[in-house]
Amino acid sequence: MAASGEARRVLVYGGRGALGSRCVQAFRARNWWVASIDVVENEEASASVVVKMTDSFTEQADQVTADVGKLLGDQKVDAILCVAGGWAGGNAKSKSLFKNCDMMWKQSMWTSTISSHLATKHLKEGGLLTLAGAKAALDGTPGMIGYGMAKGAVHQLCQSLAGKNSGMPPGAAAIAVLPVTLDTPMNRKSMPEADFSSWTPLEFLVETFHDWITGNKRPNSGSLIQVVTTDGKTELTPAYF
C-alpha cells in the first residue's frame, strides 16, 4: 500500500456507470490518478480505456489488456475497482432467457475476469481488487436466472483469487461487495414507488472503497461482503458458508 498522504493510482472498470462515475469523481477530488475502463470515455478521469464492443470474449479481453498495458507501462496501481454490471430478470421459461444470460455474463463475468487478470499484471503488492457481487445470488434466483448465475460466478472467482497460487500479487486482497439495491438514478426511474431508505447510497460504497484502499478496516481476501441498508443505515456483513 502507498504511504499515507501519497497520491494513489486506481483503475475503475465500469468507470462511466453510476457507481463508477462517482468513484472517479471522488478519487480525482483527492488528487488521485484514476483511469476509467468502459465502453465510452469518462472525461473526468485522468485517462480512459475505451472497451470495444464484440461478441468475442477473447477479443475484448485481449484489447483491454493491451490498452491498459500501454497506458500503465511498468507503473503499478493501488486498486482495481470492478464496478461494472447490470440487471435483467426472467425465469428459465422466459423468451429472453438466452439474451439476458448472455448480457449478464458479458457485463459481470467478462469484466470481473479481465479485472482479475489486470490485477496479476498491474496491481501493487498489498493492493486491492474489488468485484461486484450480489446478496441475492447467495441463494437461488428463480426470477432472474441470468443475473444470479453471473453474480454467483463472481463470488466463486473472488474466493478463488484469495487462494494459494491464484496469481494475485503478494499481500493483495480480492473482495466482492454484495449489495441489495444501489441508489442510482436508473433504479429510481425504474422503481419510483420503492422504499429508497432500503437502498444503498453510492457514497457509502465509495467511502468503503477508500477505506479498503488505504488499509482501513479492509476485510480478508476472498471475503464476500454483504451491503445491507435498513432505514437509511448501511451495514457491512461478511457472508459465511
Swiss-Prot record:
The keyword NADP applies. GO terms for molecular function: 6,7-dihydropteridine reductase activity. GO terms for biological process: tetrahydrobiopterin biosynthetic process. The modification N6-succinyllysine is found at residues 70, 76, 93, 99. Keywords: NADP, Oxidoreductase, Tetrahydrobiopterin biosynthesis. Its EC number is 1.5.1.34. SUPFAM superfamilies: NAD(P)-binding Rossmann-fold domains. NADP(+) binds at residues 11-35. GO terms for cellular component: mitochondrion. Gene3D superfamilies: NAD(P)-binding Rossmann-like Domain. The keyword Secreted does not apply. It is an enzyme of class 1 (oxidoreductase). It catalyses: 5,6,7,8-tetrahydropteridine + NAD(+) = 6,7-dihydropteridine + NADH + H(+); 5,6,7,8-tetrahydropteridine + NADP(+) = 6,7-dihydropteridine + NADPH + H(+). It holds the Pfam family adh_short. The active site is at residue 147. Homodimer. Catalyzes the conversion of quinonoid dihydrobiopterin into tetrahydrobiopterin. Belongs to the short-chain dehydrogenases/reductases (SDR) family. This is Dihydropteridine reductase. It comes from Mus musculus.
